[in-house]
UniProtKB/Swiss-Prot annotation:
Disulfide bonds: none annotated. This is Pentatricopeptide repeat-containing protein At3g60050. Belongs to the PPR family. P subfamily. Keywords: Repeat. The keyword Repeat applies. It comes from Arabidopsis thaliana (Mouse-ear cress). PPR repeats lie at residues 148-182, 183-217, 218-252, 253-287, 288-322, 323-357, 358-392, 393-427, 428-462. It holds the Pfam family PPR_1. PANTHER family: PENTATRICOPEPTIDE REPEAT-CONTAINING PROTEIN 1, MITOCHONDRIAL, PENTATRICOPEPTIDE REPEAT-CONTAINING PROTEIN 2.
């Protein structure tokens, strides 16, 4: 890409004015005496000590009331969840819930629905969807209570997890009939589930025609739809929606162009990518921080460190300081291209520029070293990040455990698993399955079984044990 075509951007720097009002102003005392400041002592009728004590007392009382309310809601939610679990043939959920005599509030509804969502599994999907809807109907019938948009969204999430797509659509209709507008969050929930079911286009068409779609904070409904489609990687559908958008007389903005640029890159349409970039400039839109992030990703994966350096320098010239995100995106791309020397160069340049590498950046570097078989450098980077106060996350640990296993250092890998748990970082299924798979390949079957037993003992991924027994990396 010819970066000479990149237009400069006007940088608007907001000035913030802070106004400090001192209590000293009440009595005219600015550190001098009556003669120094020219004002006599003023009595504002404010006894500071007694009033502060009173305010503190009120604060404690408010906090206490709030704590009691939260405790009461959590306790009531637990009772409701236990009651719903009693569901059997002939079970009258309405009368049983009435007998609980709980105070229905938005918090109670949220806690119950979240509780159902957490307990949802492959075996109880249909039951969970039914119980959630029964509770939703019952709570909506209680006096002095009305469901919120968040309540509808939580129930939609449960329906989505349970594969109840028709129920989701009916709930959207109920939500609109109840006077609530559909939002970008509503559409996002629908598109995530409908995309998996092959109904994404149907959802898009309905929202494009909807008169109750509250698309804020986006410029128009099309941007809200395009943004959600990008999140679920519906690239072909993005192209179709963009054509509909132009036919309806809507103009693209920087966000629209960024979505289209990324879409065409993912579809491998680089000629179209270049044309869009030029079109963006002709329409008077300067590349923003996200546009440059896309460019750096492409240059990184294309193993073009010199062009990337030119882009970073150009960003500074137009007033956009490269952030940790920009450097990490570039380093990730170069790492995937196998250019770890360039990765280290840009990591050092990042530090020189005053950007502190975060856990994601370090994890990208560690993963790159592991993949290339440079375990010693991965270990060194792991030590460096902890010394500099960046706590490893589950992805960091997974990369390190994989690297140790690849090098046959199984004792260290098992020790690292215990370390991450002691630091409050819960291993995910990938961590366990990676370790078990490599132990098996090395013929260390007893050690592999021990890891599985520890996992089950802690209650982690018990339902996935059969999958792990067949797991091969």
């Amino acid at each position: 890409m010819n970066l000479a075509l990149v237009l400069g951007t006007n940088v608007v720097r907001k000035a913030y004015r802070f106004l400090f009002i001192s209590r000293k102003f009440c009595n005219g005392n600015f550190g001098g005496n009556e003669i120094d400041n020219g004002f006599p002592d003023l009595d504002c009728g404010f006894d500071e000590d007694s009033n502060i004590s009173e305010l503190r007392s009120i604060d404690r009382e408010v906090i206490s009331v709030r704590s009691r309310f939260l405790e009461s809601a959590n306790h009531s939610a637990s009772r409701v969840l236990v009651t719903l679990q009693l569901d059997e043939s002939g079970f009258n959920s309405k009368s049983v819930l009435d007998e609980l005599n709980v105070r229905v509030s938005g918090l109670l509804v949220r806690e119950v629905l979240v509780g159902i969502l957490r307990n949802l599994s492959y075996d109880n999907k249909a039951r969970c969807a039914k119980l959630a809807y029964r509770f939703f109907l019952w709570s909506g019938e209680q006096e002095c209570f009305r469901h919120t948009v968040n309540s509808y969204h939580l129930l939609m999430k449960i329906f989505a997890e349970c594969g109840e797509y028709k129920a989701m659509w009916r709930l959207v209709d109920e939500m609109v009939q109840d006077g609530f507008p559909t939002t970008a969050r509503t559409f996002n929930l629908l598109i995530c589930s409908c995309g998996e079911a092959g109904l994404a286009k149907q959802a898009v068409v309905q929202f494009m025609k909807s008169k109750t779609f509250n698309y804020r904070p986006f410029k128009h409904s099309y941007n809200a739809i395009l943004n959600s489609l990008l999140g679920v990687k519906q690239y072909k559908l993005i192209e179709w929606v963009y054509k509909q958008m132009l036919e309806d007389g809507f103009s693209p903005d920087v966000l629209t162009y960024n979505i289209l640029l990324w879409t065409n890159y993912r579809l491998g349409k680089m000629d179209r990518f270049d044309r869009l970039f030029d079109e963006m400039a002709r329409d008077g839109f300067s590349p923003d921080s996200y546009t440059y992030n896309i460019l750096l990703h492409i240059l990184g994966k294309g193993n073009k460190p010199l062009a990337a350096l030119t882009t970073l320098n150009h960003m500074k010239e137009v007033g956009i300081d490269p952030s940790v995100l920009h450097y990490t995106t570039l380093i990730d791309g170069l790492s995937r291209a196998g250019n770890l020397e360039a990765c280290k160069y840009f990591l050092d340049e990042m530090v020189k520029a005053g950007c502190r590498p975060d856990v994601v950046c370090y994890t990208v570097m560690i993963t790159g070293y592991v993949v290339s078989g440079e375990l010693d450098k991965a270990k060194e980077m792991f030590r460096e990040m902890t010394v500099k106060g960046q706590l490893p996350n589950v992805f960091t640990y997974n990369s390190m455990i994989r690297g140790l296993c690849m090098a046959g250092e199984f004792r260290e890998a098992c020790w690292l698993l215990k370390e991450m748990e002691s630091r409050g970082c819960n291993p995910n299924f990938v961590v366990y399955s990676t370790l078990v798979s490599y132990l098996r390949k090395a013929g260390k079957l007893s050690e592999a079984r021990k890891v599985i037993r520890e996992m089950v003992k802690k209650g982690h991924y018990v339902h996935l044990v059969p999958k792990m027994m067949k797991y091969r990396r």
